[in-house]
A protein has these predicted regions:
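Membrane-embedded transmembrane-helix bundle of lipid-linked glycan/lipid transferases
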Residues: 1-155
Length: 155
């Protein structure tokens, strides 16, 4: 039984590292390597083995947000670059469904991250309003998808 729990925890930590490496590989600040890049592996392992992850290693319900957070960030970057919002909708709705409290915190982080990214860009007002509208629309869709599960729990 204990070995199974440890294997399950190792799989979850590995998934957190995998999603972080997926985000970092697509990030514009990290150069795409021709082979295996050690920076990608080091930062993915550092994210997966962070103090938060290790502190809650035996409480599996908190780990879903750690796994999905890089995908939510990548989804926000996709929304900003007009690549679509399917990844953002799927990752955010799964995060909210898997754990309401941490999902709520990820939603707050998403707003702060999006605002920080948009403030850092110098774009015309029309494009700014379009990006904000798309972010709000995709966030509401993710909230509506997760509401199918969360609303009956509250009432």
């Amino acid at each position: 039984m204990i070995a199974g729990i440890n294997i399950f925890a190792a799989i979850r930590i590995g998934l957190a590292g995998l999603t972080c490496s997926i985000y970092l590989y697509g990030c514009t600040t990290v150069k795409k390597p021709r082979g295996v890049d050690m920076k990608l592996s080091v930062f993915s392992a550092a994210y997966a083995l962070s103090a938060y992850t290790l502190a809650f290693i035996n409480q599996f319900m908190w780990m879903d947000a750690v796994i999905c957070l890089p995908l939510v960030i990548k989804g926000i970057d996709n929304i900003r670059s007009k690549k679509g919002g399917i990844l953002y909708i799927a990752a955010l709705s799964y995060t909210i469904i898997s754990n309401f409290y941490i999902g709520y915190m990820v939603c707050l982080f998403s707003v702060v991250y999006f605002a920080g990214c948009v403030i850092g860009e110098r774009i015309p007002r029309g494009q700014l309003l379009e990006k904000i509208w798309r972010f709000l629309l995709y966030s509401l869709i993710a909230g509506a998808i997760s509401a199918v599960y969360t609303v009956p729990v509250y009432y």
